[in-house]
């Protein structure tokens, strides 16, 4: 498994993807992505960083089936409405957008898209909402992503939504690797929560 991840991370890097985009594509942290890429370079073989503590989440069996995506989006929608009425669904690019699109249909809500910091060349900035989708000003929103790894993207999305005049009601995700209950006073609900034992 590790060698396949190293090869895939290197392949994506060679295609020009940023560290953040590779992390998003493989559902791993940016630290893990950097470590994997370093494994393929002979220059860094002598001074490798300590192996990060992370899990790779592969949900391709869900993502490759529109009916499975529908079922998962329905479950995420069900968790969202437990918190209240939603005006718009904000999908975190890239992998949160398919869920958000289906959820917006289920919830009869508008669709917005958030581009996280990790997809930008200048990672000292903050994420941004796409202008090609719904304006979320004065709307109650649910924020959707596939996997929480560190929680930084979710926190950034919440802050950007608030800065743009929205009321983030809840965050829903497929998998939470961090074990978060909330971020910036917004509850986080996950279908699967990974907890480390020991």
From Swiss-Prot:
Spans traversing the lipid bilayer: none
Stored InterPro entries: GfcR-like, PRibTrfase_dom, PRTase-like
GO process annotations (BP): pyrimidine nucleobase biosynthetic process; regulation of gene expression; UMP biosynthetic process
Transcription as UniProt keyword: yes
UniProt-listed SUPFAM superfamilies: PRTase-like (SSF53271)
Single Gene Ontology MF annotation: orotate phosphoribosyltransferase activity
UniProt KW keywords: DNA-binding, Transcription, Transcription regulation
Protein's UniProt keywords contain Transcription regulation: yes
Pfam families attached to this UniProt entry: Pribosyltran
Family: Belongs to the purine/pyrimidine phosphoribosyltransferase family. GfcR subfamily.
PANTHER family: OROTATE PHOSPHORIBOSYLTRANSFERASE, PYRE-LIKE PROTEIN
Free-text note on domains in this protein's UniProt record: Contains an N-terminal DNA-binding winged helix-turn-helix domain and a C-terminal regulatory domain (or effector binding domain) resembling phosphoribosyltransferase (PRT) domain.
Protein known as: Transcriptional regulator GfcR
